[in-house]
């Protein structure tokens, strides 16, 4: 049996995620896969993703992975990264598409009118680079990670949960949710595989996580 399945739907640098997981869990059986049955049988599932959410959802459907991802999000330790966070939500302003509807809320674009720093200078979209993450709640995946640690971001859209599912916030320039926690799901807007020690710690915590 595969210990960790990394869902491969052709949208993201999956090798960097796999390499980071191999580093923190050298004895684990890790599969980068587009096979729905491998995803269903894995003990843990990671859904990364980069690019446009409509394209990601279309590829999930083309490969027959949508229901396997939904089943994983309902039944086993599940980590979403970047678009893997956004697609969990009900809908997105990006292409006005419906998401998987697993986490109540929506995905919104950074509004051009609000993208100014405290000096009035224009901020670029996408939000790209290192930023602090404030831990909104205590969670097993934050273990041994200092509050307000810096993680690496690349995104033009952010999530807005409808319920109290937020587990972390960042600011660009306003506060936005960058991590959600719901039952056996933990999902982040930033890229832990690119976030050096803090990111590796989070991935190691995921490998050991036993949701109640």
From Swiss-Prot:
Q: What positions constitute the catalytic site? A: 82, 191, 193
Q: Could you tell me the keywords of this UniProt record? A: Amino-acid biosynthesis, Cytoplasm, Glutamine amidotransferase, Histidine biosynthesis, Hydrolase, Lyase
Q: Does the keyword tRNA processing apply?
A: no
Which Pfam families has this protein been placed in? Answer: GATase
Q: What is its main location?
A: cytoplasm
Give the EC number.
4.3.2.10, 3.5.1.2
Tell me which residues make up the Glutamine amidotransferase type-1 domain: 3-212
UniProt catalytic activity: 5-[(5-phospho-1-deoxy-D-ribulos-1-ylimino)methylamino]-1-(5-phospho-beta-D-ribosyl)imidazole-4-carboxamide + L-glutamine = D-erythro-1-(imidazol-4-yl)glycerol 3-phosphate + 5-amino-1-(5-phospho-beta-D-ribosyl)imidazole-4-carboxamide + L-glutamate + H(+); L-glutamine + H2O = L-glutamate + NH4(+)
Q: Which InterPro entries match?
A: Class_I_gatase-like, GATASE, Imidazole-glycPsynth_HisH
- Kindly give the SUPFAM superfamilies that the UniProt entry links to this protein: Class I glutamine amidotransferase-like (SSF52317)
Record GO biological process: L-histidine biosynthetic process
**Assembly description:** Heterodimer of HisH and HisF.
Please give the name of this protein: Imidazole glycerol phosphate synthase subunit HisH
Q: Which species does this protein come from? A: Nitrosospira multiformis (strain ATCC 25196 / NCIMB 11849 / C 71)
Q: What would be the name of the gene that encodes this protein?
A: hisH
């Amino acid at each position: 049996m595969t210990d960790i399945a990394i869902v491969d739907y052709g949208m993201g640098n999956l090798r960097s995620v796999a390499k980071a997981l191999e580093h923190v869990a050298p004895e684990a059986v890790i599969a980068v896969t587009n096979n729905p049955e491998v995803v269903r049988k894995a003990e843990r599932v990671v859904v990364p993703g980069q690019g446009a959410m409509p394209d990601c959802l279309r590829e999930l459907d083309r490969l027959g992975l949508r229901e396997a991802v939904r089943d994983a999000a309902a039944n086993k330790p599940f980590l979403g990264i970047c678009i893997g966070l956004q697609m969990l939500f009900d809908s997105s302003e990006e292409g006005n598409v419906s998401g998987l509807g697993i986490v109540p809320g929506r995905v919104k674009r950074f509004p051009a009118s609000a993208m100014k720093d405290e000096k009035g200078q224009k901020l670029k979209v996408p939000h790209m680079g290192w930023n602090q993450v404030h831990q909104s709640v205590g969670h097993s995946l934050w273990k041994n990670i200092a509050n307000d640690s810096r993680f690496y971001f690349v995104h033009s859209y952010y999530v807005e949960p409808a319920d109290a599912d937020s587990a972390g916030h960042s600011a660009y320039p306003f506060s936005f949710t960058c991590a959600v926690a719901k039952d056996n799901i933990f999902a982040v807007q930033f890229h832990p595989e690119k976030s050096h020690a803090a990111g590796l710690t989070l991935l190691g915590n995921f490998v050991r996580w036993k949701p109640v």
